[in-house]
Amino acid sequence: MVAHAEIKNLSFVYADENEKALQHISLSVQKGEFIALAGGSGSGKTTLLKHFKKELLPIGKRTGDTYYDGTLLENVPDLLSAQEIGMVFQNPENQLVMDTVIQELAFSLENIGLPSHIIQKRIAELISFLGFQDLLHQSVHTLSGGQKQLVNLAAVLVMQPKLLLLDEPTAQLDPIAAKEFLGLLKRINEELGITIVLSEHRLDEVIPLATRVICMNNGRIVYDGSPKTVVANMWEVEKFRPFIPQIPRLFLEWNAKDIPFTVREAQMKLNDFLAISYVSEPIVQSEKQEVILSAEHISFQYEKNNPLILRDLTVSIEKGKWVALVGKNGTGKSTLLTILAGLQKARRGKVKWNGKVIHKIDSKERFKSIGYVSQHPYYHFTFDTVWDEVYERARELYGEQGKEIAEHQLKKFWLYGLKERHPHDCSGGEQQLLALCTTLLSKPTLLLLDEPTKGLDPWKKERVGELFRKLQKEGTTIVMATHDIEFAAKYVDQCMMLFDGAVIMNDAPKEFFSGNFFYTTSINRFIRKELPYALTWEDVYEACQNDMLHS
């Protein structure tokens, strides 16, 4: 049987680079498969995905061949490629080109010359399948991140593709929107028979849906097989263990024979007579510190007649604390961070830092002492190479020592090998690290971070978490907006949930997540009855070794 898509002995090196991005890749994709691509940031996942669609082939030197339905990729007709091979990218903003949702859906169909009655029929049928009729005539600029990504997916599906490629499509979505999006992909795969190849760091949600997992490292495929086989292989190698989702990781630590991937499967394996002593874990209250940053009665809207994004919001941040702002896309987390940083002025209310109104602080002092990283790190970049980006800032701050400091900083953030690369050619995770790297050069005492772990693989995420903890011990206060609730549960001191422009929940992670039904970690959903305050596999493992399993 001819493979749906096939890659034979593919190697690739980007223009102006020496290191190979892909090395001797061979794989075949069968019709109807749901393949999850796993691996570290910069391991070659995005580069590999782009080699399935000829319009996206990166510029550089390649050897080897790619086939689509038995035809060499470069010989596949343009119209066929446009219709049958679709791709959804990480950033929802980057693919939207029209003003309204219906225009966005019609755009690609008009480009391939379909008559208007066929376009109308296709859109009507697709909208009925996806169920978002209420968004059809809305401006794309008013949509939340989750809705924008849904529109991107719909704009690809309306072409009726046979192969769907997705590059970390949930990276900027809140946990509930991400779950819905991935569930929709599974439905598309099962009900429409569309083949899916998906690169994703959120393996907790993806692995239970996938029929096959491919793990990459340094441009090579290291594991390829069923989810259970690949996870078992990853467990054997220490450096791949952080990539294993929380529930299977816990059961592997317990040396269980049959590894569950979902909450339901895991609960079926629990012992019914779990010792009651595990249930009520006391919460240790941390000492109160002085308030270093406060927002008092903040209200904000972008345009005068637009609805308020923040309404009469008041928050206090204590010195040396690490605070996570969580909540759905569009609840005002990013807006609040820019107001706290003094980059935008509230319509009403005021922000104080160290007792001073933020806008009355000298802008030079503010820029040096307050480090802000946007959720779109490429907004920070002004130079043509990674090296210049870091070196020029280091030289500005430290003069002759700048070169040595820049080298040290790049090595610390795993970016030294990319120093000659253009920042915009870096992966999403690498861009995130570069923005963080340059921001930390001035040793700010307040860090305001918008999605700092976005695009980072689990291993780098752990290292960044440890770095932030070290900065905390040195007196740095950290406020981050995040959709990564597993990361927040493991590292932060305090969680605040924004909803309808206000803070509706504010607590330490254990109390915060244990009180939630949907907005919590997979481990907490699995074992909340027995261990209400357990949020990570480490929490459960420390509480009890393996006596929770059925014998």
Swiss-Prot record:
Domain ABC transporter: 5-243, 293-525
CDD domains to which the protein is assigned, alphabetical: ABC_cobalt_CbiO_domain1, ABC_cobalt_CbiO_domain2
Binding site for ATP 2: G327, K328, N329, G330, T331, G332, K333, S334
Enzyme class: translocase
Annotated SMART domains: AAA
Binding of ATP 1, residues: G39, G40, S41, G42, S43, G44, K45, T46
Enzyme Commission identifier(s): 7.-.-.-
GO terms for MF: ATP binding; ATP hydrolysis activity; ATPase-coupled transmembrane transporter activity
UniProt entry keywords in alphabetical sequence: ATP-binding, Cell membrane, Membrane, Nucleotide-binding, Repeat, Translocase, Transport
GO cellular component, one term: ATP-binding cassette (ABC) transporter complex
Keyword Nucleotide-binding belongs to the record: yes
InterPro entries: AAA+_ATPase, ABC_transporter-like_ATP-bd, ABC_transporter-like_CS, ABC_transpr_CbiO/EcfA_su, ECF_ABC_transporter_ATP-bd, P-loop_NTPase
Annotated function: Probably part of an ABC transporter complex. Responsible for energy coupling to the transport system.
Protein name per its UniProtKB record: Putative ABC transporter ATP-binding protein BA_3364/GBAA_3364/BAS3118
Organism lineage: Bacteria, Bacillati, Bacillota, Bacilli, Bacillales
